[in-house]
Swiss-Prot record:
Similarity field: To ferredoxins from P.putida and C.tartarivorum, ferredoxin I from A.vinelandii, ferredoxin II from D.desulfuricans.
Protein encoded by which gene: fixX
UniProt-listed PANTHER family: FERREDOXIN-LIKE (PTHR43082), FERREDOXIN-LIKE PROTEIN YDIT (PTHR43082:SF3)
Job description of the protein: Could be a 3Fe-4S cluster-containing protein.
Record-given protein name: Ferredoxin-like protein
UniProt xrefs under InterPro entries: 4Fe4S_Fe-S-bd (IPR017896), 4Fe4S_Fe_S_CS (IPR017900), ETF-QO/FixX_C (IPR007859), Fd_FixX (IPR012206)
Amino acid sequence: MKTAIAERIEDKLYQNRYLVDAGRPHITVRPHRSPSLNLLALTRVCPAKCYELNETGQVEVTADGCMECGTCRVLCEANGDVEWSYPRGGFGVLFKFG
């Protein structure tokens, strides 16, 4: 009889490694007076929690830990809120399990 082991997604994500390209983030947020609804949504839907509101009400991105899933591209790139490009070769997420 097999024993089921409950694994949390956070435990699996912890196994991934990230090589940060210091000074060259692959994601930038366009300067804004007040964040669009899509930017505000990113603070909740980004699976890596890269987006957050700062103390002045602006949405900021921390690309360290980005899983390059494309959620921000789908949600915000068309209206210009976010600029996204692939990290340079050798940088970005290194998936341990697939």
